Structure formats: C-alpha cells, structure tokens
C-alpha cells in the first residue's frame, strides 16, 4: 500500500515509521527545508508520568520505541527519570496521595517518595531551601528534540526506504491524491495529515466547531553547564502538579491550586509551570508558559521569561543561569482527548492536537492507530 504523510514533525515521523514497519511504501512531505515546528522546540521530555492511567501502556510503548529509534538512528537518549520537587506541605501531600493511589497498580514499582536528603542525593539541581522531599519516577527519558527529530528521516530512509520531500508544501489532499506546491500530483492508498498547528491549509472546515486551538509556549536554554555538571533526572515542581492530568484525583490538589491562584494569579493567567531538562551538550532547557487561541501573538514579551525564571530559581539550583537561547513554540491542543484523529475523506486521516504530549505519545499513538486501521 502507498502511504502519503504530510508533516515531518514527530507525529508524521511516528506514522511513517509504523506504516513502513508494516511493509508499506511511505512518502513524507514537509514544507520546510528541515523540521522546525513544535517537535524541535520542546524539552525533549518523554513524560510518561504526566499521562493519565488509561494512557500508561501507550506512553510506555512510546518510550520503548524512543530507545529503539535512538539506537538505530544514532541520536542521544537518556533514561533519566524525573523528580517532582515539593517545597510546600500541600505539594508533598499531593505527591504522597498520588503514590498511595497507585500503591496497588503497575505504576507503583516505578514510583518512590524521597525525603529531603534522598532527593538531594539524587540531584544537585534541587534548591535545598525549603525542600520537603520529592516524587521519583523512573519512566521518563530525555532526548535532544532538534537532533533527534532531524536525524530520523535519514534513518527511516536507510532502514525502510521512506521517501522524504522537504521544502515541499502540500496544497491539496483528497482520496488517493496529494497535490504539492509545484503542481505535481502524487497517488496514495492512504494519506495521514500531521500538519501540527496549521489549521488553515488542508481541510480547514474540519476544525470548525472542534475544541482544538493553538498554544504558544516560551522556552529558554542555558549555556553548557560548567565542569560537566549534570542535573540527573528531569526536574519539575509544585506548579506542574496543576498542569498534567495525572494528579487530578489527588484530594489536596484543589487546595494547592487555590493557594497558587491567590499568591500569584499571573501564573494561572500566563499558564506558567516550570520544568528543566538537560541535553547531551550539558545545556539546561527551561520553560514554560501557555497562551491559547487569540492570546497567541508573534511577540515574545520578556516579562513572561522573567516570571518563568523567578519560579525556577525557587525550586532549582543551577551552577550557571546564563542563557544561550530563547524561543517560543506553538502546538495544536485538542481538549476532547489526547489526539484529534478524524477520517476527513475515504483513506484520508487528520492526526494532530497532541498538545504538550506529542513527544511522549506520538510513537505509541501511531502504533495504536496502524493496528486499528489495518487492513485498508
Ligand atoms: C515549547 C514546547 C515544549 C514541549 N515540551 C514537550 C515535552 O517535553 N514532551 C512532550 O511529550 N511534548 C512536548 N511538547 C509537545 C510536542 O512538541 C508536540 O505535541 C509535538 O511536537 C507536535 O508534533 P506534530 O508533528 O503534530 O507538529 P509539528 O512538530 O509542528 O509538525 C508539523 C509539521 O507539519 C508541517 N506542515 C504543516 N502543514 C504542511 C503542509 N501543508 N505541507 C507540508 N508540510 C506541512 C510543518 O512544517 C511541521 O514541520 C512541547 C511543545 C512545545 C511547543
């Protein structure tokens, strides 16, 4: 079967891989000379812990596929795990409730509550001032998104003969056919549209009335940390407990959310929660904020970065905070589920809306999709 894919972000690559592994003849079209969207602008966190319980097996499948892809394609991956640091009693309480809730589940073997000194022995990146303890999880991985996503096409071509057409915009897609900007027609049996936050070019009518919108995030990266300093696991803190759905069932979360809303309403307004990951070059990637829909402006205002840094300093210690880069990314966020997957014409499927989970879930979701979709 001939499969055409629009977009060489992580979603498009995931579909290309899953389709090619099933023996299909795959062609990927990407309008930019190299992937430059959300997939290369993120933390590189394979954030299994942030996923709701019903997504754990898909997230773990994704994680395994990342490790496999890294070996095959030759990019860096670290099974670094993660720590949620607690600097307030309510944060510690939420973490304790989360562990208690998962005591009888498969997740239990991956989780451990650490006291203050155990936490400090796991990372020298935790700010010891007011540190109460942390939640350790061993399931998270780290990749450098830019090098990982940009190295996968060569590997997929080498290993599975996937064809990539970069600098090639798809201007029209319909059953059996893709038309590109140079007027060429390409014939396919199945087409998967992984065009990220571009809701305007292909099937714009499909997005009308659907709870999907763009979300803009501010990000920063430090210079290489001195003397080979390593952060160890990914670090997150109390603000993150409000962000991912996994902590929703914890009874103390509402009180924590209320405290933060009262103490610092701008954090809710700007969707700020803070996290840090460290790439293979020793640089620490820092973020982030969330502005949705009509709030998305092309201008990056420095006050957002200042708020992010102020919160990071409260929970994280770094040998140097000197910044090497600032940027923003935009992803498509679908709020009625973790991905927007819709057949828009016979044999043509739109697959986007992964929000802040695309790096974590794309490989697993694409596998799941191809096992459901087959045979045509
Ligand atoms: C700042 C930031 C931090 C994040 N951190 C994490 C994280 O740590 N962990 C995690 O799991 N997720 C994270 N995410 C989310 C994750 O990055 C996204 O969910 C994911 O990258 C979306 O992938 P995508 O392939 O759908 O979109 P994209 O990466 O945007 O790719 C879409 C591609 O389609 C191409 N395209 C669009 N239209 C056409 C067309 N007509 N013809 C040809 N090509 C076209 C675009 O050029 C683009 O390359 C983060 C996102 C951001 C922005």
What positions do the PLM features span?
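N-terminal Rossmann-like FAD-binding beta1-loop-alpha1 element of flavoenzymes
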Residues: 2-27
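Glycine-rich FAD pyrophosphate-binding loop
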Residues: 21-40
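Dinucleotide-binding Rossmann-like beta1-alpha1 core, especially the glycine-rich loop
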Residues: 43-122, 131
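Short beta-strand to alpha-helix junction loop
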Residues: 57-58, 85-94, 135-154, 299-304, ...
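Helical element adjacent to the flavin cofactor pocket in flavoenzyme catalytic cores
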Residues: 136-175, 186, 190
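Central helical "cap/lid" subdomain
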Residues: 185-252
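Conserved FAD/dinucleotide-binding core of flavoprotein oxidoreductases
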Residues: 213-216, 223, 237-313
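C-terminal catalytic lobe of FAD-dependent flavoproteins
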Residues: 271, 279-285, 291-376
């Amino acid at each position: 079967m001939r499969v055409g894919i629009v977009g060489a972000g992580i979603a498009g690559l995931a579909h290309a891989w899953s389709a090619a592994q099933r023996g299909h003849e795959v062609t990927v079209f990407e309008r930019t000379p190299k992937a430059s969207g959300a997939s290369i602008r993120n933390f590189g966190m394979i954030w299994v812990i942030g996923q709701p319980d019903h997504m754990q097996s898909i997230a773990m499948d994704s994680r395994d596929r990342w490790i496999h892809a890294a070996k095959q394609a030759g990019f860096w991956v670290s099974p670094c795990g993660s720590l949620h640091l607690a600097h307030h009693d309510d944060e510690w309480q939420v973490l304790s409730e989360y562990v208690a809730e998962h005591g009888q589940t498969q997740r239990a073997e991956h989780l451990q509550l650490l006291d203050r000194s155990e936490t400090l022995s796991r990372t020298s990146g935790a700010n010891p001032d007011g540190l109460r303890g942390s939640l350790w999880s061993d399931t998270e991985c780290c990749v450098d998104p830019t090098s990982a996503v940009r190295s996968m096409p060569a590997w997929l071509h080498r290993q599975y003969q996937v064809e990539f057409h970069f600098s090639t915009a798809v201007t029209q897609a319909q059953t059996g056919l893709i038309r590109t900007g140079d007027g060429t027609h390409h014939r396919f049996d199945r087409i998967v549209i992984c065009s990220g936050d571009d809701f305007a070019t292909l099937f714009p009518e499909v997005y009308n009335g659907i709870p999907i919108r763009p979300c803009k995030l501010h990000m920063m990266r430090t210079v290489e940390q001195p003397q080979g300093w390593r952060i160890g696991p990914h670090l997150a803190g109390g603000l993150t407990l409000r962000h991912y759905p996994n902590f929703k069932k914890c009874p103390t979360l509402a009180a924590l959310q209320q405290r933060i809303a009262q103490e610092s309403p701008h954090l809710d307004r700007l969707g700020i929660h803070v996290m840090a990951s460290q790439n293979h070059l020793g640089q620490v990637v820092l973020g982030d904020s969330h502005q949705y829909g009509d709030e998305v402006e092309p201008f990056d205002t420095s006050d957002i970065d200042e708020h992010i840094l102020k919160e990071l300093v409260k929970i994280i210690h770094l040998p140097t905070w000197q910044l090497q880069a600032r940027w923003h990314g935009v992803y498509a966020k679908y709020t009625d589920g973790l991905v927007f997957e819709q057949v828009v014409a016979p044999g043509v499927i739109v697959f986007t809306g992964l929000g802040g989970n695309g790096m974590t879930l794309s490989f697993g979701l694409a596998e799941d999709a191809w096992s459901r979709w087959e045979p045509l």
